Amino acid sequence: MGKQCYVTGRKASTGNRRSHALNSTKRRWNANLQKVRILVDGKPKKVWVSARALKSGKVTRV
């Protein structure tokens, strides 16, 4: 499984990079994911969590 937020499901999104001549090539916007230890079913587990989920208090560190 690739890098994806364990809580919110956020992951990298894709789009186009545009030059001044309006040529397009593919690019990615990566989500701000942090590897943190959280409690899952009463046991600590290391998972990828988005910074937005950490700041909003949807998950607490161990």
UniProtKB/Swiss-Prot annotation:
Top-level taxon of origin: Bacteria
Keywords: Ribonucleoprotein, Ribosomal protein
Ranges where the record places region Disordered: 1-23
Family annotation (InterPro entries): Bacterial_rp_bL28, Ribosomal_bL28, Ribosomal_bL28/bL31-like_sf, Ribosomal_bL28_bact-type, Ribosomal_bL28_sf
GO biological process: translation
GO molecular function, one term: structural constituent of ribosome
Protein name per Swiss-Prot or TrEMBL: Large ribosomal subunit protein bL28
Lineage: Bacteria, Bacillati, Bacillota, Bacilli, Bacillales
Encoding gene, per UniProt annotation: rpmB
